[in-house]
Amino acid sequence: MTVQTSKNPQVDIAEDNAFFPSEYSLSQYTSPVSDLDGVDYPKPYRGKHKILVIAADERYLPTDNGKLFSTGNHPIETLLPLYHLHAAGFEFEVATISGLMTKFEYWAMPHKDEKVMPFFEQHKSLFRNPKKLADVVASLNADSEYAAIFVPGGHGALIGLPESQDVAAALQWAIKNDRFVISLCHGPAAFLALRHGDNPLNGYSICAFPDAADKQTPEIGYMPGHLTWYFGEELKKMGMNIINDDITGRVHKDRKVLTGDSPFAANALGKLAAQEMLAAYAG
């Protein structure tokens, strides 16, 4: 007999009217083991350049019916790219807008993954004790050691990052100083921070999570309601081209902006980023 899993969002008792994804959606879109592979970098980078991770610091995303989606950064989208980059020789630092700890979607953590989980435990303190982004931005100059800015996905990237002047300043610095910008899924929502000023990403092409898919997720209880706005629409208004309209694990390179469409792209994006950064900094 087939056991039917519920499509009702699960209550998050830590907050009023807040919900995790349904059992059904978790059964379809999460796994206890990731698809990490291809971590093979025989000549890793040995220098001082590193990655700046701009992480989410808020968990609760309001939906159109007033219910809150319990979110944060998606663990697969965060950890798999970083695993590849770390293996390629690039250390990383974590910053949030507030300087408060990173929020993760722990319901998507690959708890039985024998490579990813030790990596997370090894670096957990960076996520628990991040830098304040404004302090990082104040120190940026042409000689700064950050080789890339990485904005992980998860719906937590929709909260605060698109309105942050510090996010805008960090992205402007990266593009103007020929650094890499890496993101996937909902992470490119952070690019919206550029829409009210100098926008060096105008005309760039990226992969991102499709708005059409976000509009379908409440049907399976992934979110407890519909989003109140859609970041893809807004990115297009600011002159960006989203090249995918579905979720296939696709990645894309436009100059030094490297993007992926979903958690299914996390491993491939990690490979792409590691290869591109090694070519740029260890060649």
Curated annotation (Swiss-Prot):
It comes from the Bacteria. Zn(2+) binds at residues 86, 91, 123. GO terms for cellular component: cytoplasm. Its EC number is 3.1.2.-, 3.5.1.-, 3.5.1.124. InterPro entries: Class_I_gatase-like, HchA, Prot/Nucl_acid_deglycase. GO terms for biological process: DNA repair; methylglyoxal catabolic process to D-lactate via S-lactoyl-glutathione; protein repair. The keyword DNA-binding does not apply. Transmembrane segments: none annotated. It is found in: Cytoplasm. It is an enzyme of class 3 (hydrolase). HAMAP family: Deglycase_HchA (MF_01046). Homodimer. This is Protein/nucleic acid deglycase HchA. The gene is hchA.
